[in-house]
Amino acid sequence: MNQLPHVTVLLGEAVEALVSNPEGTYIDGTFGRGGHSALILQHLASEGRLLAIDKDLAAIATAREKFATDARFAIAHDSFASLKNLAAERGLVGRVQGILLDLGVSSPQLDEAERGFSFMQDGPLDMRMDQTRGPSAAEWVNTASEDEIAWVLREYGEERFAKRMARAIIAERQKRPFVRTGHLAEVIKAANPAWEKGKHPATRAFQAIRIQVNRELEDLEAVLAQAVDVLAPGGRLVVISFHSLEDRLVKRFIRQQEQGDPVPKGLPLREAQLNKTMRSLGKAMKASDQEVEANVRSRSAVMRVAEKL
């Protein structure tokens, strides 16, 4: 299968929203293949600094190759859920001018059969963004209970045939454990009685299993909670999400920070006592028609920006 080149989504828009001070310190929480990082560095002065983070060793190798000679750049092999610890180690808590999170899976991860993310081509059933840690998709699918599998497919994939698919997975693994993506895709496909037009019948299930294996929503909740402390006053949080589960989390978090602490109705509190920490900057942004035409994977992208008070 031909690999699509990785095209960074909402590149200019994200960096424009992020970089408010060329001499500031910034964090790219999802380095990927370095599209956002490269443009951030172009916007920074010699005093500016960029710390990039990624779970994927392939991304780490790319970062070290691309920016080896740039003294403003550093890369950490970790999850962005470790944001505050990584910032604390470098004395950056409360001093960062901007944090960028470009969520989801990069094109090389999706297109490389050996990574095990794709139902379109057969490969080892892995799906881990960080292949040095945690159980693979095969280990999870072969050991999880029927109820757990059904819950994950329903909650993370919004799959209406979750119970039916979970039952089929359990029945099949008793005959032959899952080790390949093609095997799992065929079982899910057979258990899906109503295919959505233009969408592979295993799409939602594979998304759900990937989210489960990589703890994507837990990590997102963790990094959002830490971002407020890591940012300097006036610092910005820019998040690009690719499905409704992520976007709902981000939208709810920003709204909560804008509203501050919940208080009983009628209690005489001044505005400053509500502990509001952030304000939303503008409305959610989507990729333009031109960008979607050039990069079909950008069609579901939603970008939200908030600023620390």
UniProtKB/Swiss-Prot annotation:
Query: What is the catalytic activity of this protein?
Result: cytidine(1402) in 16S rRNA + S-adenosyl-L-methionine = N(4)-methylcytidine(1402) in 16S rRNA + S-adenosyl-L-homocysteine + H(+)
Query: Does the record's keyword annotation contain Kinase?
Result: no
Question: What is the protein's name according to its record?
Answer: Ribosomal RNA small subunit methyltransferase H
* E.C. code: 2.1.1.199
PANTHER family attached here? 12S RRNA N4-METHYLCYTIDINE METHYLTRANSFERASE, S-ADENOSYL-METHYLTRANSFERASE MRAW
Question: Mainly resides where?
Answer: cytoplasm
Q: Give the UniProt keywords, A-Z.
A: Cytoplasm, Methyltransferase, rRNA processing, S-adenosyl-L-methionine, Transferase
Tell me the name of the encoding gene. rsmH
**Compartments where found:** Cytoplasm
GO biological process terms held by the UniProt record: rRNA base methylation
Transferase is among the record's keywords: yes
Give any Gene Ontology cellular component.
cytoplasm
Q: Which InterPro entries match?
A: RsmH, SAM-dep_MeTrfase_MraW_recog, SAM-dependent_MTases_sf
Q: What does this protein do?
A: Specifically methylates the N4 position of cytidine in position 1402 (C1402) of 16S rRNA.
The enzyme's main class, written as a single word, is: transferase
For the ligand (S-adenosyl-L-methionine), the binding residues are 34-36, 54, 80, 102, 109
* Protein family: Belongs to the methyltransferase superfamily. RsmH family.
